[in-house]
Amino acid sequence: MTYLPTPCRVRDLPGCTLLTLPPEIDLSNATTVFDAVAGAVHARGDRLAMLVLDLTGTRFMDSQGARLVDDVRRLLGPRVPLRVAASPSGVPRRVLELTGVRRDVPVYDDASQARSA
C-alpha cells in the first residue's frame, strides 16, 4: 500500500460532490478512506445532492473496497444518489461485479458519465 497523506481528493461540482479515491484500497486503508468519505458527506449535510466515487485511478482494490462502497451507500440512504466511476477493464470494477455491489450502485466508465447520467 502506498502511503498517501490524504486518503481522497474532494471536489464540489455543480450538482454533485466528486471524491477521487486512492490508487489502492485494501484492509490497510479502507477504514481511513471511509472516514474521509463520511467526513465529506457530513460536512456538506443537506447541500449534498449526489456523491460520485471516482475509482478510475484505483489500480488495486480487494473486498474491503467493495465493502467501503456499500458502507457509503448505506450512509447516504435513499436521499442522496451514489454513483461510482470505474475503468471498464480495471480491478475495482471487477471486484464490484464479483461482490454484487454493482447491483445496488450504478457504475460508469468515468466520472463525467457518472455525473451526467
Task: Label each residue range with its predicted role.
Residues 16, 105-106:
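Short, conserved active-site loop motifs that form the nucleotide-linked donor/cofactor pocket
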Residues 106-117:
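A charged, well-structured terminal subsegment
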Residues 24, 88, 111-113:
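Short, solvent-exposed coil/turn elements at secondary-structure transition points
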